[in-house]
Amino acid sequence: MAPTPPPKQKGKLTLAQLAAYDDIVTDALVDRAFFWTKIRKNRPKYFAVRGVVEDDVTSILLHDVIVAKDVIKAEKSLLNLSGLRKYVETLKSDKEKEWFRRHLRKYIAIYLPDCPFEVTTTNRYTITTHEAALSARKFIRTGDTIKHLSGTLVAITPEEEKTLDLTRRDFSIVMSSRKKTPSLFLGPARFSNHDCNPNARLVTKGSEGMEIVAIRDISIGEEITVSYGENYFGVDNCECLCHTCELSLSNGWSPGGPPEHDSRASTPETTEHQEKSSSGSEKRKSPPESPSHPSEDMPSKRPKFENILNLRLEISPPSSPDPIAEPLITVNGGLRALRSHFASLAGKSDLRHFQKPHSNFISASSSSDQTSCSLCPDDEAPTSTRSTSATSISDSNVQVKTEPTVEQQPRASSETAPKTISGDHGLHVQDIIRDNDESDLSDLSASWEINDREMTAVKREPVKKKKRKRKSSIIPTIEHEAPKARTPGDYTKTPKLLAQRYDRWVDCQTCNAWFVQGDAYLTRKECPRCERHSKLYGYRWPKTDREGRNDTEERVMDHRTIHRFLRTEDEARVQRRGRGVSHATSPTPDVSENKTETDASEFGDERRLTRSLRRARSSLRLAI
């Protein structure tokens, strides 16, 4: 009998699939259920699903989940929404669709009236941003498994772990004590934060499930916390900012704060920077020096050519009668070197006799050798309004001419006779340069100029150069500021969260917690957490359903019928001085502290009076 083949391994839920499911469900069932902020998504480039409207979601949660307590019916109603329906259609297999429905049911169950917790936020960790948290709305006994607080575990491969180290955005990675492998857990249980003295612990259920069990009594309004590990926030959790560390002034809440980083290595030396900058400026300002081109003979200004493309150089060796065309001569190339060399030689020999150097003075391309150049005589070279007189050299025939597009004019006879120099290496100089205002080639050098009347070169008077004094300046450096030491309670009643003029801290009339109300022209009664609870369940927080037969309070089915602001007489008792900011911080809010919200002195004497006092004054005026 042939052995039976091994059973095929069932497909497992991957990390990418679970992260996508969790982003879709939290966007639909948390962010669009009267939530005052956005839950962090696993994918950084997540876009909200279209076709999911907040009114439709909250209506399904109220009628199907809270009142009817039918999770299956609510699941079907939610999947009929256009946004979720289109997403389910994109899933390839039936198994993937079942995984998504299973994950959706976990989030639907947290809205059941018997659920002992709810999703809220806290700004204890970052002050300016709110992180998700879990708050108990029912008393939880020690050893009880917190109902509906579960999650899904997925093992992380080494490749995925490397990617998550760079892109992960929250603390959803746990180390399994049984498998000794890192795993990502998502679901409602992911919102439980860390505490060094937690009131609950994570327990695995099956191969892919996770639950949270209370290890001590959890009272109403207390945050549900677990332990992430001993070294999760640094060595011995030295950077932990949990509530226990806040009360004990330890770890991240220690008065000393984090150590400051030494910034001397990142700060450049001032003198070295100045020397580099001065040397760089000198290199830019001064021309390059060479043995054949002294620095004092170089022109002070760089000549500019308007028609530089029309200027060409043709070089032919003495043995061949036909000239060979060469590339264009640039301003910094042959012509400038030729003019500079003539000026230096003319200065040494007083424009009468000078000897040609044996070294070449025109730099050609890297592939060709350097060669001596000469200009044609006056009667052979055509001129134009853009050209100057040329200088001829007997060793080689070098012509500077313009393109036919330039208008040419007959050249006038030269007033000065050409100067000749005898010798094998002698040079015949016919004309040094002519005065032409339209061309910058008329400049011999910085030390010579042309006499207009005699048409001769005259040495210029030396010009005194002003030495610029080097100014010492402070070099600004970009350094990262060391994180400031945290103080207990610095995230409550702080001015850092009052961005607008009318923002202020307000005391909740239900849970006695301080919250920031934006544009607080009228003071709200409840904080966002209590107001959201009232809109969803129709009762005041933390009540979710009738408490026995004798409870006659009716559930409010339409939240729009509830007035969410203080009454006139209650508003009159509120002091607006200080905008609710407290300078003496404490880890727990002081309930007995007077509610001081907006400084009335900023708006004048007229706004110091509340509306009730204005009405009383107007009634007195009418009576009189």
Swiss-Prot record:
The keyword S-adenosyl-L-methionine applies. Residues 115-229 form the SET domain. Residues 462-472 have a biased composition (Basic residues). Its EC number is 2.1.1.372. One of its GO terms (biological process) is methylation. Residues 259-287, 592-609 have a biased composition (Basic and acidic residues). Pfam families: SET. GO terms for molecular function: histone H4K20 trimethyltransferase activity. Coiled coil: none annotated. One of its GO terms (cellular component) is nucleus. Residues 397-419 have a biased composition (Polar residues). It is found in: Nucleus; Chromosome. This is Histone-lysine N-methyltransferase SET9. It comes from Coccidioides immitis (strain RS) (Valley fever fungus). The lineage of its organism: Eukaryota, Fungi, Dikarya, Ascomycota, Pezizomycotina. The gene is SET9.
